[in-house]
């Protein structure tokens, strides 16, 4: 009975959520697009000409937002191939419905074959921005969930260390709780500028927080 009450309450909140309605109206696949939009408007992360990698991209709302943002710059050059001023590469283990001008690679970004596809798309350039809305399946066991969350952040940090340009940025989702301070410390060891962001589009009941790292530190 309690589970049914929870599901009913969640469905009620979801249906009446203004960001859900806005996403449906504006064609975004998930309300998460507005979390990235708010952070981007505050921190000016997405700019014309960038190479952007979206880790754990499915269903694709973050890639959609990035694509729409880069398309505005491309309007000045209607003949530009691809229709956007920049490159967006989305990666996920799960399939993702195509998005115009977004390159999608399905697979584990730790595998050599996936990295080879990424490097072919990037060419001689380095990545300007890595974004990750990845989240594990939470079990409700605090210690286990904290370890899963930290593991995903570690993967994003390692990917950024290998592929991000020196003045690039990494934005990842994490959750307040056990292990949060360790994740922040790892960001501080890797980036010169670190900030936490809690966009209004993030539900009040949620402990999710986004950590932003800018400007890689040189390896010791």
Swiss-Prot record:
Chief location category: cytoplasm
E.C. number: 2.1.1.166
Main enzyme class: transferase
Subcellular compartments: Cytoplasm
InterPro entries xref list: RNA_methyltr_RlmE (IPR050082), RNA_MeTrfase_FtsJ_dom (IPR002877), rRNA-MeTfrase_E (IPR015507), SAM-dependent_MTases_sf (IPR029063)
Gene Ontology MF annotations: rRNA (uridine-2'-O-)-methyltransferase activity
The keyword S-adenosyl-L-methionine belongs to this UniProt entry's keyword annotation: yes
One annotated Gene Ontology cellular component of this protein: cytoplasm
Entry superkingdom: Bacteria
Reaction(s) catalysed by this chain's protein: uridine(2552) in 23S rRNA + S-adenosyl-L-methionine = 2'-O-methyluridine(2552) in 23S rRNA + S-adenosyl-L-homocysteine + H(+)
Annotated signal peptide: none
Positions in coiled-coil regions: none
Active-site residues per Swiss-Prot or TrEMBL entry: 173
Residues the entry annotates as binding S-adenosyl-L-methionine: 60, 62, 92, 108, 133
UniProt keyword annotations, A-Z: Cytoplasm, Methyltransferase, rRNA processing, S-adenosyl-L-methionine, Transferase
Function: Specifically methylates the uridine in position 2552 of 23S rRNA at the 2'-O position of the ribose in the fully assembled 50S ribosomal subunit.
PANTHER family reported in the protein's UniProt record: RIBOSOMAL RNA METHYLTRANSFERASE, RRNA METHYLTRANSFERASE 2, MITOCHONDRIAL
HAMAP family: RNA_methyltr_E
Protein family (similarity comment): Belongs to the class I-like SAM-binding methyltransferase superfamily. RNA methyltransferase RlmE family.
Protein name per the record: Ribosomal RNA large subunit methyltransferase E
Species the sequence originates in: Paraburkholderia xenovorans (strain LB400)
The organism's taxonomic lineage, starting at the top: Bacteria, Pseudomonadati, Pseudomonadota, Betaproteobacteria, Burkholderiales
Designated gene of the protein: rlmE
């Amino acid at each position: 009975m309690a589970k049914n009450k929870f599901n009913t309450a969640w469905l009620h909140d979801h249906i009446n959520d203004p960001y859900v309605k806005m996403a449906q109206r504006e064609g975004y696949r998930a309300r998460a697009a507005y979390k990235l939009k708010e952070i981007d408007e505050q921190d000016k992360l997405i700019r014309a000409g960038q190479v952007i990698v979206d880790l754990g991209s499915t269903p694709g709302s973050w890639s959609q937002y990035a694509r729409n943002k880069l398309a505005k710059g491309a309007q000045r050059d209607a003949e530009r191939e691809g229709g956007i001023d920049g490159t967006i590469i989305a990666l996920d283990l799960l399939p993702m419905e195509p998005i115009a001008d977004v390159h999608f690679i399905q697979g584990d970004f730790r595998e050599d074959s996936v990295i080879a596809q990424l490097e072919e798309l990037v060419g001689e350039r380095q990545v300007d921005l890595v974004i990750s809305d990845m989240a594990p399946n939470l079990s409700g066991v605090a210690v286990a969930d904290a370890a899963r969350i930290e593991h995903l952040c570690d993967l994003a940090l390692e990917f950024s260390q290998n592929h991000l340009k020196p003045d690039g940025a990494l934005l990842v989702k994490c959750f307040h709780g056990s292990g949060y301070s360790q994740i922040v410390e790892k960001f501080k060891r890797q980036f010169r500028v670190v900030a936490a962001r809690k966009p209004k589009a993030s539900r009040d009941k949620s402990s999710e927080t986004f950590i932003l790292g800018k400007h890689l530190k040189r390896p010791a």
